[in-house]
């Protein structure tokens, strides 16, 4: 975007806003940095290779260049915030019809991130930029499951439970707790549940 040398501060500000919006649409990494203050107003965004890697790979999944992805990072690396909260909010900008199914070893954790995702989408920052892409369907408006007007939805479940939902994107964020991870029985339970239940919920891609 080229502006005349005499461009006013208001014009420069508007041009910068357009550039930032376009950057956030094209790059999940840019979206994460720009959206960070909405969800973590008291914590400064700190760039890092792990953030870049997560964003790069999740964007590749969205674009169909990666089918299956495992993310292993240290606790406190913003994995849940980036993967379970920001990712579906960003993907709905370009593909609002996507249907998501999220799970965790505790239902409360999956519910927490579902609420955070909706908070981000309903924020003035998001609505001012992409509020015309879709609206929430008020007839399908629950914390555990909400749907938009493009027929996309975000639903949650927990490890070990069944679900009748089908999805385009299936995410299990922490299938076991840190304590359970050392237990062969708990790992086997999580693996059996994933292979026997969650993996069968994916729509044909």
What are these regions (language model features)?
Residues 55-59, 81-93, 173:
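Contiguous, well-ordered alpha-helical segments that form the cores/surfaces of helical PPI scaffolds
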Residues 143-197:
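Conserved RecA-like ASCE ATPase "motif II neighborhood" in helicase/translocase motors
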Residues 1-67:
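N-terminal accessory segments
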Residues 65-88:
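Walker A/P-loop
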